[in-house]
């Protein structure tokens, strides 16, 4: 398949630049992967679609304030976007400046902190913090929330809370697992009260999630890698859920990729997994774990719309997107959601 097959025209006014006042006030488009049938719902209607005994799997990564501003010792301004934390002092980062910093050069951050350019790895820079503090502490002090480029506004104080799930736990993402943004504590409590089981995996979403696919055919694309963790207790819960004939419902493409990565790493049999994954899911992929998913609307030609197309069928998904545009759903990170069931292979 060609990357251009996943293109669609989106009116600019359908890109959500701010979240809804209430987390669960978004709309929900349902898509039956087998029939292609669509339903226009409210997000709170999801409660009626998840059955007792079903297992919902969430990504509990925490978005770090990954964007920092500063200048080179020579005086030129620069912007740093953390791609991943290597340890307490070192990061891999994208650096935007008129000229790339040289090895061993100093970078002066806002707030008086200093970093040293240690090495270059393709398009990424390895930077070391020269401070008693940890990278996380400095980011919390001077970092900005790394809103996606299409939101096209400076970050605001409200984004510190709203570009973060209510159940976030493990710091390391530079983009939110956005399907989870729709859930508030009351909705999670209502799901549990109904007998729905809840589990958490971790995948630290990298900035690569926003990188355009720069090749013509899908098979040429090289996925960026991200760190994921699927613990043993989640593996056990999934086995119990499947044995009882119930569904595994992944909240977000990052949860899907975590679970399917764990299955891929052990040749289809699900085992605990911790490490880097570069899994690329596109039409033709056979899903091993996930039966249904909650997901937002994704960018044209992105690897994420390819994943959803693999799950529910290419024609069904592209038709659903045209319906969403006609019905003026809100798109991307702060936008509305879909509930999608898997197409049988």
From Swiss-Prot:
Catalytic activity as recorded in UniProt: 7-aminomethyl-7-carbaguanosine(34) in tRNA + S-adenosyl-L-methionine = epoxyqueuosine(34) in tRNA + adenine + L-methionine + 2 H(+)
Listed GO CC annotations: cytoplasm
Main location (coarse class): cytoplasm
Organism lineage string: Bacteria, Pseudomonadati, Pseudomonadota, Gammaproteobacteria, Alteromonadales
Function: Transfers and isomerizes the ribose moiety from AdoMet to the 7-aminomethyl group of 7-deazaguanine (preQ1-tRNA) to give epoxyqueuosine (oQ-tRNA).
PANTHER family: S-ADENOSYLMETHIONINE:TRNA RIBOSYLTRANSFERASE-ISOMERASE (PTHR30307:SF0)
Subunit structure: Monomer.
Alphabetical UniProt keywords: Cytoplasm, Queuosine biosynthesis, S-adenosyl-L-methionine, Transferase
Source organism: Shewanella baltica (strain OS185)
Pathway membership, UniProt: tRNA modification; tRNA-queuosine biosynthesis
Protein name per UniProt: S-adenosylmethionine:tRNA ribosyltransferase-isomerase
Pfam families per the UniProt record, alphabetical: Queuosine_synth (PF02547)
Superkingdom as given in the UniProt entry: Bacteria
Keyword Thylakoid in record: no
Subcellular locations according to the entry: Cytoplasm
Enzyme Commission number: 2.4.99.17
A single BP term in Gene Ontology: tRNA wobble guanine modification
Presence of keyword Nucleus: no
GO molecular function, one term: S-adenosylmethionine:tRNA ribosyltransferase-isomerase activity
SUPFAM superfamilies per UniProt: QueA-like (SSF111337)
Family: Belongs to the QueA family.
